[in-house]
Amino acid sequence: MLVLGACGDDSGSASQGEASGGRAAPLSLTLTESGCDPTSLSAPAGDVKFAVTNTSGLKGEFEIISATPEILTEEFLDDGASGTFTVPLKAGQYQVICGAPSNTRADLVISGEGEAAPEVKVDQGELDAAVSSYQGFVLQQTEDLAASTKSFTDAVRAGDMAKAKQLYAQVRVPWEQIEPVAELFPDSDAVIDSRADDFPKAEEDPNFTGFHALEYGLFAGGSVDMPSLADRLDSDIQNLITQVKSLEIQPQVMTNGAAALIEEAAQTKITGEEERYSGTDLVTLQANVDGANKVFVLVSPLLATTNEQLDDDLAAQFRKVQQTLDGYKTADGFEPYGQVSEADRAKLKTSMAELSELLSQVTGSLGLQVNQ
């Protein structure tokens, strides 16, 4: 887990120097209302230390992305959260996203050789086949998302609130299942799946679009009169399909993304923050678990040859998480999240955190590069 925070820097750029005793001083970065401060960062290759604080007044997302693009680290920060973290980076050019993807980003230049990345330990042909299968899965899920969402948005446009509310949770499942790689298309993520917390005016902000804006109107606002939001969602998902068709997913993106998704679920989604208006969080959590499990199933035969114990532990941990979720299944889905006891929420949080920790070991166990 990456723990974030610390103080900002008033200058336009920052470099990693040395602290007392020869230790590398962390790069200081502030998440402001408009984005990153400073907007230019540099450090030598290797374990790069960061110190970040969020003063934006909103819950914010912090990410480092490579030119691939590949998400190298991401974290959600409450306003005022602080801390330090370290991430291994090879020489190259990166970008830092502070808050919304449209905010001012920071350019990060990593120079020098640094520590060499590990060699792939598994059969390259089998690894390529697993990645190809996953890429096909992501495209199929995205196309399924477009079709199912069209039924939902048609109900909104027709003014059929009962049908729209009935369809809402299930049409989101394909999206939630591909979230291990959703940050490869951050602009689509921002317009399809953003929360009201991401915007200065919350639910009343004109830039609040996507599933959760429609969820708010249906379940909290008591209105189905949202044809423009419905049209925008259909259009944004079509744009997503175009992006997915041209993606080349790297294996470490799959494995790191699965771990990051379950970590996010354990830290934030478990609180009920995502589906706060509809109470359909168990559907979302199940889809996230299924999405991470898809990655695991594809790499499991390879993992069994390099770290059989980890492979066994992951299979057992997925079963453990599923057992808790199964306790709240109904004939047509899941009980509302408000029905989940505090004890079971705590159990889910713990078991999903343990699952995330195990998943975070897969990339290294397969001998994959942490970043490219």
Show which residues each predicted segment covers.
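N-terminal edge beta-strand
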Residues: 22-44, 147
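Extracellular/periplasmic metallocenter environments
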Residues: 28-31, 77-119
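Beta-strand signatures of extracellular beta-sandwich domains
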Residues: 61-65
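Mature extracytoplasmic or organellar-lumen-exposed domains after removal of signal/transit peptides
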Residues: 116-372
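Surface-exposed loop/edge segments in extracytoplasmic proteins
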Residues: 69-75
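Short, low-complexity, disordered segments immediately C-terminal to signal peptides
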Residues: 7-28
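Beta-strand cores of secreted/periplasmic/IMS beta-sandwich domains, seen most often
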Residues: 39-58, 83-99
